[in-house]
């Protein structure tokens, strides 16, 4: 299954707020309607929608998400928590959480167009797995700096998670540590996602 490229509002109307996909928010009326529908949903539907929320927020294909679930299952610790940590440490998500892009799809575009450096080297792979002490910067060209500065200027500093530090005037972000799950940028029940896949095998 390919990455979703359809209307964003259609997805948030059904699944709720997905900040990685779009800055738009569902209306109060839609949220109330979803809550009423939620009480009538089957357990399968609830698990499916949690999985879809994760997939659309991080902009993954079905195959990519399944791969992350399998890697998480082989790691030490809670599969759900490891899954969220892996997704949060993707370069496209880090760029988004630093405020260098408005959404994850936009961050992915910046990376694909080679505007982003990790530790002084161009990285053009959005799924690149970042690690503590990595330094993320805009390429030393005016176009790259202008693109990223536009978003840094408007990004709310109070929403910056505690595992990241940003230096807007240097077009630079630093990863301090692996993310604590309470700072994950999406309201999600990751255990339902793991359960969804465990029942598919």
Swiss-Prot record:
Location in or out of the cell: Plastid, Chloroplast
Coarse class of the protein's main subcellular location: plastid
Pfam families, sorted = Ribosomal_S4 (PF00163), S4 (PF01479)
Cite the S4 RNA-binding domain residue spans from the record: 89-151
Q: Which domain of life is it from?
A: Eukaryota
One GO biological-process annotation of the entry reads: ribosomal small subunit biogenesis
Provide GO CC annotations from the record: chloroplast; small ribosomal subunit
Family of this protein: Belongs to the universal ribosomal protein uS4 family.
Q: What does this protein do?
A: One of the primary rRNA binding proteins, it binds directly to 16S rRNA where it nucleates assembly of the body of the 30S subunit. With S5 and S12 plays an important role in translational accuracy.
Q: What NCBIfam families does this protein's entry cite?
A: PRK05327.1, rpsD_bact
The UniProt subunit note reads as follows: Part of the 30S ribosomal subunit. Contacts protein S5. The interaction surface between S4 and S5 is involved in control of translational fidelity.
Q: What protein name is recorded for this chain?
A: Small ribosomal subunit protein uS4c
Organism name: Phaseolus vulgaris (Kidney bean)
């Amino acid at each position: 299954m390919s990455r979703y490229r359809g209307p964003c509002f259609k997805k948030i109307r059904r699944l709720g707020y997905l900040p990685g996909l779009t800055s738009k928010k569902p209306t109060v009326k839609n949220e109330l309607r979803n809550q009423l529908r939620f009480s009538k949903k089957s357990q399968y539907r609830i698990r499916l929608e949690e999985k879809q929320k994760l997939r659309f927020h991080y902009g993954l294909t079905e195959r990519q998400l399944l791969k992350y679930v399998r890697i998480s299952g082989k790691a030490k610790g809670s599969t759900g928590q490891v899954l969220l940590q892996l997704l949060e440490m993707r370069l496209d998500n880090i760029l988004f959480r630093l405020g260098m892009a408005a959404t994850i799809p936009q961050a992915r575009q910046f990376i694909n167009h080679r505007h982003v450096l990790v530790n002084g080297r161009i990285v053009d792979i959005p799924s690149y797995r970042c690690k503590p002490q990595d330094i993320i910067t805009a390429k030393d060209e005016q176009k790259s700096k202008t693109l990223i500065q536009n978003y840094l200027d408007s990004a709310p500093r109070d929403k910056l998670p505690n595992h990241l530090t940003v230096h807007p005037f240097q077009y630079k972000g630093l990863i301090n540590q692996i993310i604590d799950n309470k700072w994950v940028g999406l309201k999600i029940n990751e255990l339902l996602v793991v359960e969804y896949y465990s029942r598919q095998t």
